Curated annotation (Swiss-Prot):
PROSITE patterns: ATP_GRASP, SUCCINYL_COA_LIG_3. The gene is sucC. It comes from Persephonella marina (strain DSM 14350 / EX-H1). Belongs to the succinate/malate CoA ligase beta subunit family. Binds 1 Mg(2+) ion per subunit. Substrate binds at residues 264, 321-323. The lineage of its organism: Bacteria, Pseudomonadati, Aquificota, Aquificia, Aquificales. The keyword Phosphoprotein does not apply. GO terms for cellular component: cytosol; succinate-CoA ligase complex. Its cofactor is Mg(2+). Coiled coil: none annotated. Mg(2+) binds at residues 199, 213. It comes from the Bacteria. This is Succinate--CoA ligase [ADP-forming] subunit beta. Heterotetramer of two alpha and two beta subunits.
């Protein structure tokens, strides 16, 4: 689960991490009031969306007086902000953050995340802050410093100090920066985060270090332990279909293609999308119905898929284990009768009760296209989608 910048900074402040003073605002009047509470200019007016690249997209403004705060707040609130991370559809700005200005001398990048190749947490840092880390990795990979964090010992103070030293921070701030990194790790562990990022961490002209932008992603599977964080969820930052899918306990992510996928298991779902790409098509979604799906959930999955106007074909690829093929067939038949699909449906299934499942589909009277292999199913889906 993602949270907004102002929410991430609230959490950071609980751990004693240095964040500038600021207030969220949902209306122009609240924005002006927030600026008045800060009591000095300049202030920064920041659009709050779950995506990076806000500055380049015009979502971060420097205001030198109340009139400018009012003007920028009116411009941003209610706007759909398009950045390189949002896709062409953008994300709605329903709130902004009014924050005190900071005299920036130098910018840095710091993050803690899981390195899947090492199966351990790492802390990453770079002296090239303010840029997207992917851009730094592509253009200047040697500028990225990494330290592997021992799962039993945690981030050790000497590691944190070494990172601060390699970043080139002034000697009088090395211990302070090292303490900041250790607190960041503490936050990561205690709040069940999957990623924490500071971009940028700034050295101010007054000689302080301040967190200018904060990002936290939380592990969805651990949210039951954090009701306060669950309350921070903003459904406006997700597509309507993704919100519906959550209500149905389905793992759904909308993509830009025209071939919908319905699969059980995340690994098979990704392999299915890769196969569609290999066959020359573009997947319209990631959809994992899970191993315990029933006929009703299959029907709900169909409804979500068919709500996407871009879908020109549906490829159902199921390996029947816990989710038996006859149960899948029952769900497909029920869903087809309820929603009357207007696009071709290709079905490939293997595993438990596969013959019974195929028999049920064949006798259903529905216009379903069988496939014996994933490759055959992907090719048929691409061919039929191109004709639609």
């Amino acid at each position: 689960m993602k949270v907004h910048e102002h929410q991430a900074k609230e959490i950071f402040a609980r751990y004693g991490l240095p964040v500038p003073k600021g207030y969220p605002a949902f209306t122009v009047e609240e924005a002006v009031e927030a600026a008045q509470q800060l009591g000095k200019f300049p202030v920064v007016v920041k659009a709050q969306i779950h995506a990076g690249g806000r500055g380049k997209a015009g979502g971060v403004k420097l205001a030198n007086n109340l009139d400018e705060v009012q003007k920028y707040a009116a411009e941003l609130l209610g706007k759909t902000l398009v950045t390189f991370q949002t896709g062409p559809e953008g994300l709605p700005v329903s709130r902004i953050y009014i924050e005190e200005g900071t005299n920036i001398d130098k910018e840095f990048y710091v993050a803690i995340t899981l390195d899947r190749s090492k199966s351990k947490l790492i802390i990453m840092a770079s002296s090239e802050g303010g840029m997207e880390i992917e851009e730094v990795a592509a253009k200047n990979p040697e500028a990225i410093i990494t330290e592997v964090i021992d799962p039993f010992l945690g981030l050790r103070p000497y590691q944190a100090r070494e990172i601060a030293l390699k970043l080139g921070l002034p000697k009088n701030l090395l211990n302070k920066a090292a303490g900041l990194f250790v607190k960041l790790y503490e936050l990561y562990m205690k709040e069940d985060a999957s990623m924490v990022e500071i971009n940028p961490l700034v050295l101010t002209k007054e000689g302080n270090i301040v967190i200018l932008d904060a990002k936290v992603d939380f592990d969805d599977n651990a949210l039951f332990r954090h009701p306060d964080i669950m309350e921070m969820e903003d459904p406006t930052q997700e597509s309507e279909l993704e919100v519906k899918a959550k209500q149905y306990n389905l793992n759904y992510i909308k993509l830009d293609g025209n071939i919908a996928c319905m699969v059980n298991g995340a690994g098979l779902a990704m392999a299915t999308m890769d196969t569609i790409k290999l066959a020359g098509g573009e997947p319209a979604n990631f959809l994992d119905v899970g191993g315990s799906a029933n006929a009703e959930q299959i029907a709900n999955a169909f409804k979500i898929i068919l709500s996407d106007p871009n879908v020109k074909a549906i490829f159902i690829n199921i390996f029947g284990g816990i989710l038996r093929c006859d149960r899948l067939a029952e769900g497909i038949i029920q869903a087809s009768k309820e929603v009357n699909p207007h696009v071709p449906i290709i079905v490939r299934m293997e595993g438990t009760n596969v013959e019974l499942g195929k028999k049920m589909l064949a006798e259903s009277g529905l216009d379903l296209i069988p496939a014996d292999t994933m490759w055959e199913g992907a090719k048929k889906a691409v061919e039929l989608a191109s004709k639609a």
